[in-house]
């Protein structure tokens, strides 16, 4: 074997990794020595700094939906064939500074402002007689953590008793890679988040619960209509060589290596008035790449924004009665970067199997979207998705009728025996991540010289792992083959387990529609196999012609799920299939059992399974809270760079203010926006809000200085729809004030730009 030499860059990266790992292990060891307790999900999770809510600014804006904590009875049963329908939407943005963005796993990709707010969108559907109901919640996050779900269910139980439960509530993430991290309890994700943020966790939980509260309050009789159609020109398979590992006979049944079908539910009241929309479609929200530092909802969020703005005329983004949820599906190997991978340094094509370049290696092989930049690519992909949903929504005519039925189990996914046939039984494995996990994907490469498709370990990395984390057992090595194990997460338990063992599996049916809530990212072919198996199981026991949709990234996150054949190639998705080569077969067996129980009315006979843990004393953020300071002679909100006197459509207004850390505002759930764009209306002699920070036309940048100093820069990209007139920009923030020997307080402030004019010539 030839002696391996390292470049100066690789040597530096290795040194950096060793130092970071040593520091991490030391911190974990310290925490484990001092704490490390486990509680069940009845724990509140509030073990950190109490939030101090300061006064908030009063803004003129359209009335927002207000939830109630009461549990009103449904109206007396009426003679209608539909469902009681309730929709609700609430802000769940969390921190937009001093926190990592979740998804790419790129060190240093921390939040530095806001492009759009993140929303939780809840849809409640109840039988006409009130006998059963379900709540489907699409949340603009990278994934749902087990801790989030347990805390949401706890709060719902305290408000509504047994009305909303683990079996009839689905929390599904859209999978934006531009949302905040910090809301996890398993060690691997805490390390990726650079600590647990109770501030963000509480904000997200409250937003999810509030969206359900609003939907619950708004329940009214209505109908559900379903439609399906294909979406073109928004997807590619980012691991086509893995897809080709699947049997030719199976691939021949499909016209594409991605699922192009969108399923849309149109929700209307008994008068036919629109209430909301749910769509499921498989594409990664990674049009915004890993150079981005602005919190946003990416392409699926832009589709939801366009739909809601069209239906909620006269309302600001995030407000209005109509709610549009663009939910994820089996997107595991599906990219929106449709121009495909190429070597960014030479323009050549990448090696298809390894996603690497002749010059520069894997870090040079990247895929790009259809736009001139990531913002334009997001708009292009999101608009196409919106337009197809709009078309399907307008033409939907097939009504969904039938009872609401639910089934749920907790399963130890590290110990599932799978009956492949009459003579062969296999098992899942303790969790582990393979080498190609560290390679990243063509949507977001890593900086390490590790390629996708790696099927053999490396002596250096194996030795480093063994010294820092201990050696993986022979059992896990054999079980995970042909995956070369980089991190044996299932055998690491200090200070808490590194990845989950206990996983939620869940099916909810609405008449002839079945929603399979999957706890991760199924690849295209994995999703097809699961849908087909569940549909056949329903048909076998009398529920024929079911439409099965996959709700991706639901309830708990367990990385990827490839087919057995794709697993052999060990590209990124396979290396991230943590429970081993038979993970998909295990899920198919488990979901078939749920389908059978629903179809045979035997759900009550099923075991609930082992309850997941709820950990206390998690590693907090390593970024301290420090007092904000304004420059000498200035106050928070003062203008440092004014707007120009005059602008035209298509230009960008830029105003710079004396700022404060925007994470302070995440401690105040009533904080609605960091900015407004306002137009002076002569007819009422007052300023009217035209845009807020949920608008895609605005951008809020936070520039961190030293010793508590910072600036806030607000951009308004003037749209074609802007009318001539006089405008201004307002900035809303909160500063942390710390006096000696006194607790910190959070104080609200605002800044106002000088007026400027939009002209036509």
UniProtKB/Swiss-Prot annotation:
Note describing how the cofactor binds: Binds 1 zinc ion per subunit.
Family under the similarity heading: Belongs to the neutral ceramidase family.
Pathway: Lipid metabolism; sphingolipid metabolism
Cofactor: Zn(2+)
GO molecular function: calcium ion binding; N-acylsphingosine amidohydrolase activity; zinc ion binding
Positions of the UniProt region annotated as Disordered: 43-76
Top-rank taxon, per record: Eukaryota
KW Lipid metabolism (keyword) present: yes
Biased composition (Low complexity): 50-76
Cited function: Plasma membrane ceramidase that hydrolyzes sphingolipid ceramides into sphingosine and free fatty acids at neutral pH. Ceramides, sphingosine, and its phosphorylated form sphingosine-1-phosphate are bioactive lipids that mediate cellular signaling pathways regulating several biological processes including cell proliferation, apoptosis and differentiation. Also catalyzes the reverse reaction allowing the synthesis of ceramides from fatty acids and sphingosine.
Record keywords, A-Z: Apoptosis, Calcium, Cell membrane, Disulfide bond, Glycoprotein, Golgi apparatus, Hydrolase, Lipid metabolism, Membrane, Metal-binding, Mitochondrion, Phosphoprotein, Secreted, Signal-anchor, Sphingolipid metabolism, Transmembrane, Transmembrane helix, Ubl conjugation, Zinc
Residues annotated as catalytic: 335
Enzyme class, spelled out: hydrolase
Annotated positions binding Ca(2+): 115, 693, 695, 698
EC number from the UniProt entry: 3.5.1.-, 3.5.1.23
GO biological process, one term: regulation of mitotic cell cycle
Lumenal topological intervals: 33-761
PANTHER family in the cross-refs: CERAMIDASE, NEUTRAL CERAMIDASE
UniProt-annotated stretches for the region Required for correct folding and localization: 751-761
GO cellular component, one term: extracellular region
Positions of Zn(2+) binding: 175, 284, 521, 560
Matches recorded under Pfam families: Ceramidase_alk, Ceramidse_alk_C
TM stretches of this protein: 12-32
Protein name as annotated: Neutral ceramidase
pH dependence remark: Optimum pH is 6-7 for N-hexadecanoylsphing-4-enine hydrolysis. Optimum pH is 7-10 for N-hexadecanoylsphing-4-enine hydrolysis. Optimum pH is 6-8 for N-(octanoyl)-sphing-4-enine hydrolysis. Optimum pH is 6.5-7 for hexadecanoate in the reverse reaction.
Cytoplasmic topological intervals: 1-11
